[in-house]
């Protein structure tokens, strides 16, 4: 069982594209650039025989082989490749909900664990207000230096959110963290939620 699903419509669309390449044995390679970061991009590329990497996982499909990049594989859990037709023709879509989620464990560096909780627990809640928070640094005394953006920048409730929501969550999950500090310029209020 693969972590990625390629729908029948996507399979047929890709098989048609591959058949036009006039390269026997051509397949596709699925990978993520900058996985586990906010800049993650999920990609599908043609993969001629011999272009696959030895560590790639080969996923044999009805008409071709999809090679899954080994480093990207965990980030492709629950990913779906689909093809939807519309009046203009159609569009291939790749939904990879875990592409931007860092993979961490208890032994991961503090900054990686902070980013993980910001991405998975904190920012989804802030997104409902058009906001987000980013880790700038972890200073020597165990303080996470954070910066708000979007609807949180200039928001009158940012301090409450910082202390009651973000700090409480991070301190519960990362015992060696001692606190958080906000370095956002809250005088910029044009996008503020409150």
From Swiss-Prot:
Q: How is the cofactor bound?
A: Binds 1 [4Fe-4S] cluster per subunit. The cluster is presumably bound at the interface of two monomers.
Coiled-coil annotated residue ranges, if any: none
Q: Which GO terms describe its biological process?
A: iron-sulfur cluster assembly; protein maturation
Cofactors that this protein relies on: [4Fe-4S] cluster
The source's domain of life comes to Bacteria
Cysteine disulfide links: none
Binding, [4Fe-4S] cluster? 152, 155
Q: Which GO terms describe its molecular function?
A: 4 iron, 4 sulfur cluster binding; iron ion binding
Could you list this entry's UniProt keywords, alphabetically sorted.
4Fe-4S, Iron, Iron-sulfur, Metal-binding
Gene3D superfamilies, per database record: Fe-S cluster assembly (FSCA) (3.30.300.130), HesB-like domain (2.60.300.12)
| Keyword Ribonucleoprotein carried by entry | no
InterPro entries referenced in this protein's UniProt entry, alphabetically: Fe/S_biogenesis_protein_NfuA, FeS_biogenesis, FSCA_dom_sf, HesB-like_dom_sf, NIF_FeS_clus_asmbl_NifU_C
User: Is Signal among the key words of this record?
Assistant: no
Q: How does it assemble?
A: Homodimer.
Family from the record: Belongs to the NfuA family.
Listed HAMAP family: Fe_S_biogen_NfuA
Identify the NCBIfam families for this entry. YhgI_GntY
| Task of the protein | Involved in iron-sulfur cluster biogenesis. Binds a 4Fe-4S cluster, can transfer this cluster to apoproteins, and thereby intervenes in the maturation of Fe/S proteins. Could also act as a scaffold/chaperone for damaged Fe/S proteins.
Q: What is this protein called?
A: Fe/S biogenesis protein NfuA
Q: Which taxonomic lineage is given here?
A: Bacteria, Pseudomonadati, Pseudomonadota, Gammaproteobacteria, Pseudomonadales
The record's gene field reads nfuA
